[in-house]
């Protein structure tokens, strides 16, 4: 039977499959046509993400059904030097004990008028 796979760019791919084919097989056919690795593919049908081990029949996918292909988003790890820079920028601050203003690390007095430019400052608490 013939099914259609619609990509995010709007391109429609036609695939020749059997209802007993697994989702993994369909992803392999998409890789052959488009060059997208199966581990980066997510197939959606009727609002549900299709799992690799299941077959097309399990999802009631019939001839001329349209699947939607979405690329998997990879979570990122921040490079250690950038992570240290972000931590320095966000955590190394002084806090006013009266008005809780965040101040630069070498501050001696608060910059706000509301607390009378007090010199009662403390270091910002570190995240755990």
From Swiss-Prot:
Pfam families: Ribosomal_L40e (PF01020), ubiquitin (PF00240). In the N-terminal section; belongs to the ubiquitin family. In the C-terminal section; belongs to the eukaryotic ribosomal protein eL40 family. GO terms for biological process: translation. It comes from the Eukaryota. SUPFAM superfamilies: Ubiquitin-like. PANTHER family: UBIQUITIN. PROSITE patterns: UBIQUITIN_1 (PS00299), UBIQUITIN_2 (PS50053). Keywords: Cytoplasm, Isopeptide bond, Nucleus, Ribonucleoprotein, Ribosomal protein, Ubl conjugation. The gene is UBI3. There is a cross-link at residue 76 (Glycyl lysine isopeptide (Gly-Lys) (interchain with K-? in acceptor proteins)). Gene3D superfamilies: 4.10.1060.50, Phosphatidylinositol 3-kinase Catalytic Subunit, Chain A, domain 1. This is Ubiquitin-ribosomal protein eL40y fusion protein. InterPro entries: Ribosomal_eL40_dom, Ribosomal_eL40_sf, Ubiquitin-like_dom, Ubiquitin-like_domsf, Ubiquitin_CS, Ubiquitin_dom, Ubiquitin_ubiquitin-like. There is a cross-link at residue 48 (Glycyl lysine isopeptide (Lys-Gly) (interchain with G-Cter in ubiquitin)). GO terms for molecular function: mRNA binding; structural constituent of ribosome. The keyword Ribonucleoprotein applies. The keyword Nucleus applies. It comes from Chlamydomonas reinhardtii (Chlamydomonas smithii). CDD domains: Ubl_ubiquitin (cd01803). GO terms for cellular component: cytoplasm; nucleus; ribonucleoprotein complex; ribosome. Residues 1-76 form the Ubiquitin-like domain.
């Amino acid at each position: 039977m013939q099914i259609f796979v619609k990509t995010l760019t709007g391109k429609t791919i036609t695939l020749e499959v059997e209802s007993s084919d697994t989702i993994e097989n369909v992803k392999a056919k998409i890789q052959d046509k488009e060059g997208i690795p199966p581990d980066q593919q997510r197939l959606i049908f009727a609002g549900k993400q299709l799992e690799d081990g299941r077959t097309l029949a399990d999802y009631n996918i019939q001839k001329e059904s349209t699947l939607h292909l979405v690329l998997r988003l990879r979570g990122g790890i921040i490079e250690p030097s950038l992570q240290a820079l972000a931590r320095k920028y966000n955590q190394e601050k002084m806090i006013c004990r009266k008005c809780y203003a965040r101040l630069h690390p070498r501050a001696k007095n608060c910059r706000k008028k509301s607390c009378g430019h007090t010199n009662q400052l403390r270091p910002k608490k570190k995240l755990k």
